[in-house]
């Protein structure tokens, strides 16, 4: 298999995994969602909480689908990159959002970026690692940026003098 064909195949595999995650999410099937992960997977939620293993991932999503994420659907955005790490591993970076029924599309405030480590086991691609983070561009200009930058420099300089 040549590199271009391999990349396309992995891209299709990544799309299939993301579609399966969305299907289980939309069905509010926490345990089915968990089955898409390896038994020893790690999952970092957008708020930084670490879930370890398929069982914990499934149980947390089951709880969330019955409470805070009740009635939501998972909208997968674009796949920004797919990078193969050998025959049976790939790193996928994509965007997406969980939307409530009254939301028609993902607003910038709700949009997240995910990094997934996919692992092929017994011919099936599963998620071995998942990191989810809200997309919040870091300001690099403007009056608030200038004030915050000066405040940081003052505090750092003060701490260095005190040390």
Where is each model-derived feature located?
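Surface-exposed, charged secondary-structure patches
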Residues: 13, 42, 58-104, 156-162
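Low-complexity, intrinsically disordered terminal/linker segments enriched in charged
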Residues: 120-121, 127-163
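Short, solvent-exposed loop/turn segments at secondary-structure boundaries
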Residues: 47-48, 103-107
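A structural signal for short hydrophobic beta-strand segments in well-ordered beta-sheet cores
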Residues: 82, 116-118
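Beta-strand elements of well-folded, non-transmembrane domains
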Residues: 26, 98-102, 118, 135
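Short, low-complexity N-terminal intrinsically disordered segments enriched in polar/charged residues
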Residues: 1-39, 145-163
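Hydrophobic pocket/interface hotspot
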Residues: 21, 33-34, 41, 53, ...
């Amino acid at each position: 298999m040549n590199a271009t064909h391999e990349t396309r195949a992995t891209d299709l595999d990544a799309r299939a995994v993301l579609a399966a995650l969305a299907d289980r999410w939309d069905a509010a099937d926490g345990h089915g969602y968990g089955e898409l992960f390896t038994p020893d997977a790690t999952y970092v939620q957008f708020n930084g909480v670490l879930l370890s293993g398929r069982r914990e991932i499934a149980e947390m999503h089951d709880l969330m689908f019955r409470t805070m994420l009740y009635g939501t659907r998972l909208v997968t955005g674009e796949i920004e990159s797919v990078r193969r790490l050998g025959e049976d591993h790939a790193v996928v970076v994509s965007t997406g959002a969980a939307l409530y029924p009254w939301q028609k599309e993902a607003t910038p405030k709700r949009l997240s970026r995910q990094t997934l480590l996919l692992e092929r086991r017994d011919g099936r691609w599963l998620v071995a690692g998942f990191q989810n983070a809200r997309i919040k561009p870091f300001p690099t200009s403007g009056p608030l940026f200038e004030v915050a930058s000066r405040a940081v420099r003052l505090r750092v300089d003060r701490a260095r003098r005190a040390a």
